[in-house]
A protein has these predicted regions:
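FIC/Doc superfamily catalytic core
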Residues: 1-109
Length: 109
């Protein structure tokens, strides 16, 4: 059985985009704005594109989206709203690359 290979390289989110997403989450739901640790943010944003021996550690778009969610939530770079931001970043990455989550608000929560 052959594996399905993406025809194009996904578009990844840059730090400025993620900071805007975080700001929107804080404005909408409340919390303390700001970055607690820039290094943790940079590390989390590098994970979806991480390689080992020229092989992607997260080779599929779904694994890359999961990497955004996991690393932003588990290594919290922001003062507040880390899990909310992680979910919103994952959703933005998927949308940027032509995918949509099919979840109710209750399922997403």
């Amino acid at each position: 059985m052959r594996s399905i290979v993406a025809l194009q390289t996904p578009e990844f989110l840059d730090q400025a985009s993620v900071l805007r997403i975080h700001d929107r989450q804080i404005c909408k739901y409340g919390g303390t704005p700001g970055v607690r640790a820039v290094g943790l943010l940079e590390s989390a944003l590098a994970q979806p594109q991480a390689t080992l021996g020229r092989e992607l550690l997260h080779p599929t778009i779904h694994q890359q989206a999961g990497a955004y969610l996991y690393y932003l939530a588990m290594n919290p770079p922001f003062l507040d709203g880390n899990k909310r931001t992680a979910f919103a970043v994952m959703d933005a990455f998927l949308r940027l690359n032509g995918y949509r989550l099919n979840l109710s608000n209750d399922q997403a929560y």
